Amino acid sequence: MRILGIDPGLARVGYGVIDIQDGCQRMLDCGIIQTNSDRSDGDRMVEIAGDLRQLIRIWRPELAAVEKFFFYRSSNTINVVQARGVVVMTLARFKIPMVEFPPMQIKLAVAGFGHAEKDEVLEAVMRELSLEEPPRPDDAADALAVALTAWLQR
């Protein structure tokens, strides 16, 4: 099974692709879609959709896992919600089933503790995927954790 994990945002969308065969999981790709803050929000969303389409065409995931947010009062909230909408729409266009997980569930599934620190989650991601180097940037590592959660919570 191939899973695309996504950590949505308007400035940076983290992504991670994992493949599971015979119970063994491995990372195929990870990175970020970074948009330029000088561009309009609409142009940034078009860029996210285009880059996500490219990733889907390359890796052909069977499932997508997206980090689910619980927002607090923040001026950035609307931008993240809009970027998430672009992600959901793009996945729907490709008919890719999607699951969502809140941060605490991701931490619990991957690190074994719902209040795990970022470095504990990163260590768990590295261990689960047999990585020698930590995935960078953090958004990509977070997306891999989301993808792993989809596999571990199946």
UniProtKB/Swiss-Prot annotation:
Entries under InterPro entries matching the protein: RNaseH-like_sf, RNaseH_sf, X-over_junc_endoDNase_Mg_BS, X-over_junc_endoDNase_RuvC
Enzyme class: hydrolase
Substrates-to-products reaction catalysed: Endonucleolytic cleavage at a junction such as a reciprocal single-stranded crossover between two homologous DNA duplexes (Holliday junction)
A single MF term (Gene Ontology): magnesium ion binding
Keywords: Cytoplasm, DNA damage, DNA recombination, DNA repair, DNA-binding, Endonuclease, Hydrolase, Magnesium, Metal-binding, Nuclease
Binding site for Mg(2+) 1: 7, 139
Any single Gene Ontology cellular-component annotation: cytoplasm
Active site: 7, 67, 139
UniProt subcellular location: Cytoplasm
Any matching Pfam family: RuvC
Binding site for Mg(2+) 2: 67
Co-factor requirement: Mg(2+)
Parts of the chain that traverse the membrane: none
SUPFAM superfamilies referenced in this protein's UniProt entry, alphabetically: Ribonuclease H-like
Note describing how the cofactor binds: Binds 2 Mg(2+) ion per subunit.
PROSITE patterns the record matches: RUVC
Single GO biological process annotation from the record: DNA repair
Enzyme Commission numbers on file: 3.1.21.10
Homology family: Belongs to the RuvC family.
Biological role stated in the UniProt entry: The RuvA-RuvB-RuvC complex processes Holliday junction (HJ) DNA during genetic recombination and DNA repair. Endonuclease that resolves HJ intermediates. Cleaves cruciform DNA by making single-stranded nicks across the HJ at symmetrical positions within the homologous arms, yielding a 5'-phosphate and a 3'-hydroxyl group; requires a central core of homology in the junction. The consensus cleavage sequence is 5'-(A/T)TT(C/G)-3'. Cleavage occurs on the 3'-side of the TT dinucleotide at the point of strand exchange.
Assembly, per entry: Homodimer which binds Holliday junction (HJ) DNA. The HJ becomes 2-fold symmetrical on binding to RuvC with unstacked arms; it has a different conformation from HJ DNA in complex with RuvA. In the full resolvosome a probable DNA-RuvA(4)-RuvB(12)-RuvC(2) complex forms which resolves the HJ.
Name used for this protein in its record: Crossover junction endodeoxyribonuclease RuvC
Gene coding for it: ruvC
